[in-house]
């Protein structure tokens, strides 16, 4: 039984498709952002602390538009995803400006996340049941896990999306394959389990993140563009080190803003939830 659990939030993404800092784009009727709803759900589920992984250049805006409210809801810490925070002996390739990716974000949190933790994207709405599923699993088991959503519950009408398509066996993750340009006509069954980067991890993961990140840096084909993703670490843990990653099935809808046009869909969904009595006192 693990008494303490932490929520680690990846909020440093540049939002290239959306064209702005979507993490701090108001979505609720009273100026709430998606993150407000996620933190509310996380606190209700039983998480004790939140760690935000951000870029230094958005710190002021992030604290102003999100941090101040969130700090009233939960114990909060910040971690900077600095380009030059790398394993010993490694340096940023000359001319590189692109962030290193989600695997590097997790690497940056290694000195702060000292309890079992859930990892999420700041700009995704996962829903209260997802946070309950993952918090209960982290508290009652030492197994790492992920929340799996049905592909059809994660698509947008406004364009194609990238998803980590999962193969499962007896309730555990067998493989995860990144598919780009998915929509309802891609030929993949809509009830296929996909990952939306909602992982339940323990501090043990950091040794694998560092090992794989070092290997990635030493073998980059394109030093200016290649990115290091957390699913790569998970896949290696399963296939190289025989780790078992439990899959927690979520049948609810996921919401996110991949395109600007998605914003109204998400805002409408949040208005409806608030109208039904969810998120009182947020």
Cite the ranges covered by each PLM segment.
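Short, surface-exposed amphipathic charged segments that create phosphate/polyanion-binding patches used
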Residues: 88-99, 159-164, 261-265
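Short beta-strand-to-loop acidic/aromatic patch adjacent to the donor-nucleotide binding site
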Residues: 115-125
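Hydrophobic helical membrane-anchoring modules
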Residues: 239-244, 252-282
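Conserved core of the sugar-phosphate nucleotidyltransferase
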Residues: 127-199, 203
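Hydrophobic packing residues within well-ordered alpha-helices of enzyme cores
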Residues: 62-66, 134, 209, 266
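Short phosphate-binding loop-to-helix
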Residues: 70-116
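N-terminal glycine-rich phosphate-binding loop and ensuing alpha1 helix
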Residues: 2-67, 74-76
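Catalytic-core segments of class I nucleotidyltransferases/pyrophosphorylases
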Residues: 169-246, 271-275
């Amino acid at each position: 039984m693990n008494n303490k659990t932490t929520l680690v939030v990846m909020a440093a993404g540049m939002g290239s498709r959306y064209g702005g800092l979507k993490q701090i784009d108001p979505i609720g009727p009273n100026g709430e952002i998606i993150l407000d709803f996620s933190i509310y759900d996380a606190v209700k589920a039983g998480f004790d602390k939140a760690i935000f992984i951000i870029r230094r250049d958005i710190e002021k805006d992030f604290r102003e538009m999100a941090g101040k409210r969130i700090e009233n809801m939960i114990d909060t810490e910040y971690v900077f995803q600095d380009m030059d925070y790398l394993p010993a002996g490694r340096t940023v390739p000359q001319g590189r400006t692109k962030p290193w990716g989600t695997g590097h974000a997790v690497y940056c949190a290694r000195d702060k996340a000292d309890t079992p933790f859930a990892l999420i994207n700041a700009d995704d709405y996962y829903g209260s049941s997802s946070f309950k599923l993952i918090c209960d699993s982290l508290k009652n088991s030492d197994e790492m896990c992920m929340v799996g959503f049905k592909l059809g519950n994660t698509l947008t009408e406004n364009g194609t999306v990238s998803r980590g398509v999962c193969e499962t066996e007896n309730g555990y993750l067998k493989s995860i394959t990144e598919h780009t340009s998915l929509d309802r006509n891609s030929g993949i069954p809509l009830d296929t389990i996909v990952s939306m980067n909602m992982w339940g991890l323990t501090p043990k993961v950091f040794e694998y993140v560092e090992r794989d990140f070092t290997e990635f840096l030493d073998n980059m084909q394109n030093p200016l563009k290649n990115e290091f993703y957390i699913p790569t670490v998970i896949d290696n843990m399963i296939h190289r080190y025989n780790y078992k990653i439990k899959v927690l099935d979520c049948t609810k809808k996921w919401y996110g803003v991949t395109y600007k046009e998605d914003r109204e869909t998400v805002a409408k969904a949040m208005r409806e939830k608030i109208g039904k009595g969810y998120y009182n006192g947020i």
